[in-house]
Amino acid sequence: MKTKLIVLNYAVHALCTVFALLQFSVAADISAAAFILCAAFIAFLTIISSAVFTLKKVKNYPIVYKLYQYVPFVLLAGFIMRRAGGTALPYVQDVISVLLWLAASIVSVTMLYHLNPKRVFVQNPDFARAAAEAGLISAKNELLPKKRRGGAKFIFEALDWIDAIVQAVCTVVLINIFIFQLYVIPSESMVSEFLIGDRVIGFKTASGPKFPVSDVGLPVLRSYKRGDIVIFRNPRYPQDNKSEVKTFISQMVLMFTFTKVNLNVDESGEIKADPLVKRVAGIPGEQLVMQDGV
């Protein structure tokens, strides 16, 4: 194997290990599971990838390739689980964890680029020879499909579908957090600009989106003036860690069920009007006067 792949592999393991250590907790709640999840994933990735890159078990290459696809998602799950408990973490620890997540995600994506079946066997002849001897690839360096029958075929096809859905949902969640998100107008407050049920897209990147369940985020790159349409969290509802985790989970469930199940409800069981889509009426430094409720 080329040195580049070996270095990238070690880099991912090192970044993930430090990240996992920062999620360690002795509290008797869900936060304790964060370290266990990250550590178990890293240990499994290390064992499988070491066997593949030393050419001892080349047949496990598809597993390694799949595991690297899940690095950002597993670490994100660990980050959220650690903050779902009752113990608050220092802001500095959140910053370091986010930076480690970002670095591990970038390196893992780079690793996936080099591990792509269209490149890895062409760029690594020794790996290609070992894969051919193991019956993993053809003479044209193309992966050979495994022949499965009966129940095994059904199970693996079902797992492929589940894998595709999970990765799609996790990718959409990341896009919704940092780039843009689709919202539905719940009330008449924006008539005649928007009607009830209208869908609007809110672009987040320039507005300083926050990492889930933390105050760490991108810098705010834009300012707002009177008349701008803005999207913001409803201050009526609590925004502590427990509530933020519930909101995040409800978004995941909403996507996995194709918008059929919405768990984002208040104490009375009503769906939350959160976030809100409003028009800016006043800017910092101005005074507003209410007359006859207007």
Question: Which stretches of residues belong to each language-model region?
Answer:
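Protein maturation boundaries and topogenic segments
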Residues: 1-275
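Mid-length scaffold segments of soluble, non-membrane domains
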Residues: 273-294
